Swiss-Prot record:
Co-factor binding comment: Binds 1 zinc ion per subunit.
Signal peptide as annotated in the record: 1-20
High-level lineage: Eukaryota, Metazoa, Chordata, Craniata, Vertebrata
Post-translational modification comment from the UniProt entry: The N-terminus is blocked.
Keywords recorded for this protein, A-Z: Calcium, Cell adhesion impairing toxin, Disulfide bond, Fibrinogenolytic toxin, Hemostasis impairing toxin, Hydrolase, Metal-binding, Metalloprotease, Platelet aggregation inhibiting toxin, Protease, Pyrrolidone carboxylic acid, Secreted, Signal, Toxin, Zinc, Zymogen
Main location: secreted
Propeptide: 21-191
Tissues expressing the protein: Expressed by the venom gland.
Protein activity control: Fibrinogenolytic activity is completely inhibited by EDTA, but not by PMSF.
Protein name: Zinc metalloproteinase-disintegrin jerdonitin
Binding site for Ca(2+) 1: E197, D281, C387, N390
Domain Disintegrin positions: 400-484
Motif Cell attachment site per UniProt: ranges: 462-464
Annotated EC: 3.4.24.-
Length: 484
């Protein structure tokens, strides 16, 4: 059994609030200064990890005490995660860096069921958390010989440009004659967990913008992927970072002022080059290019799993990885088949993931329209989900298993999240074991905690291919042995 480490950090609020300061996130108009003080309660003889599996932070926001629970995002990297860059003469250089003891976390606020958190603990505490419906950011002040951090709201960040930005996908607004249920009434069915094995590519313009600092680029992409993973976990989609590319010697596909041309060329490169040497489900290009017509991103619609079209492009923002993650989540949503939100769509926040106009305000929520479309349509589409069931082996997701993180790992029968959030009657959230009498908790061949009858169609054929059928003895949907 894994020995869970309890780490308590008290953040003492500095006796004044700052009026203005320049941080990594930009110029901050108003902020609180806090000092993380770390107290570790380790069993006698235990060896402390560099980055603990579980941490707890206690601090005050607006003079109100909060308790922030953090858990290392063990599903962030695949076991065969690789990074590729290129020598000045264009030679491909691929490495397999150790990523087991990484420093990226997800979390929640105690006694706030709607709270979320995405934090990097690599060099101080950096990231964001949602408390009582409002998003706060924490970031080191980077003062000499000081552990001071700033806590601030996004509304206090000076904006580069207030003009609205656009997604390049058009003619895809939400339309439905069916009434949309309230957010609390829309349930994501307890189907089989889906996995998107993702490669993120930094183009040469982005590489140059960061002065060729590979460490900084990879850290930004790790942080982006951690945020992206946190956004999609609520749909039971596990985004696994399987590879990172840096086009260090020059662009490997056309990157122009036209988002459409850039997307087409990147898709062709992915099919011709990347797929031939790296297995993955989807690739996203992060670019330093500023596209025409204030376009921030572009993706093919309903294209997940397609060799050429399962791609998206997103403009990089050096100081705001949370916004990059929101925009990448948006384009990835189009790949899955999501429409843009209409005027009547809502998510309980000022901005939703699939809003047509790209907001400067970060959001981690899909709207009621998106959730309805996902639960009634996308989740059942065999064309855009066929590659998402080939889950990485439980041993392919690095680090030991932890019950309650939504990912079924070695030694678990199921994992429906923390007991307070679990809505699966087949799974005991406290133990990650099946409830008494249950044969299964999710899967295409699991219905009301029981295996579906042998011969039940679980995946409809595409084109001239064959349907897949349940075998009556497992929850998964086995591949038809007579497939072409």
């Amino acid at each position: 059994m894994i020995q869970v480490l309890l780490v308590t950090i008290c953040l003492a609020v500095f006796p004044y609030q700052g009026s203005s300061i320049i941080l990594e996130s930009g110029n901050i108009d108003d902020y609180e200064v806090v000092y993380p003080r770390k107290v570790t309660a380790l069993p006698k003889g235990a060896v402390q990890q560099k980055y603990e599996d579980t941490m707890q932070y206690e601090f005050k926001v607006n003079e109100e005490p909060v308790v922030l629970h953090l858990e290392k995002n063990k599903g962030l990297f695949s076991k065969d995660y690789s990074e590729t860059h290129y020598s000045p003469d264009g030679r491909e250089i691929t490495t397999y860096p150790p990523v087991e003891d990484h420093c990226y976390y997800h979390g929640r606020i105690q006694n706030d069921a709607d709270s979320t958190a995405s934090i990097s603990a690599c060099n101080g505490l950096k990231g964001h958390f949602k408390l009582q419906g409002e998003t706060y950011f924490i970031e080191p002040l980077k003062l000499p010989d000081s552990e001071a951090h700033a806590v601030f709201k996004y509304e206090n960040v000076e904006k580069e440009d207030e003009a609205p930005k656009m997604c390049g996908v058009t003619e895809t607004n939400w339309e439905s004659d069916e009434p949309i249920k309230k957010l609390s009434q829309i349930m994501i069915p307890p189907e089989q967990q889906r996995y998107i094995e993702l490669v993120i590519v930094a183009d040469h313009r982005m590489y140059t913008k960061y002065d060729g600092d590979k460490t900084e680029i990879s850290s930004k992409i790790y942080e982006t992927a951690n945020n992206l993973n946190e956004i999609y976990r609520h749909l039971k989609i596990h985004v696994v970072l399987i590879g990172l590319e840096m086009w260090s010697s020059g662009e490997l596909s056309k990157v122009t002022l036209s988002a459409d041309e850039t997307l087409d060329s990147f898709g062709e490169w992915r099919e011709r080059d990347l797929l031939q040497r790296k297995r993955h489900d989807n690739a996203q290009l992060l670019t330093g290019m500023i596209f025409n017509e204030k376009i921030e991103g572009r993706a093919y619609k309903e294209s997940m799993c397609d060799p050429k079209r399962s791609v998206g492009i997103v403009r990089d923002h050096r100081t705001r990885p949370h916004l990059v993650a929101n925009r990448m989540a948006h384009e990835l949503g189009h790949n899955l088949g999501f429409h843009h939100d209409g005027d009547s769509c809502t998510c309980g926040a000022n901005s939703c993931i699939m809003s047509a106009t790209v907001s400067n305000e970060p959001s981690s929520r899909f709207s009621d329209c998106s959730l309805f479309q996902y639960s009634s349509d996308i989740i059942h589409n065999p064309f855009t989900s066929r590659c998402l069931y080939n889950e990485p082996s439980k041993t392919d997701i690095v680090s030991p298993s932890v019950c309650g993180n939504y990912y079924m790992e070695v030694g678990e029968d199921c994992d429906c999240g923390p007991p307070a959030n679990c809505q699966n009657p087949c799974c005991d959230a406290a133990t990650c074991r099946l409830t008494p009498g249950s044969q299964c908790a999710d899967g295409l061949c699991c219905d009301q905690c029981r295996f579906m009858k042998k011969g039940t169609i679980c995946r409809i054929a595409r084109g001239d291919d064959l349907d897949d059928y349940c075998n009556g003895i497992s929850a998964g949907c086995p591949r038809n042995p007579f497939h072409a």
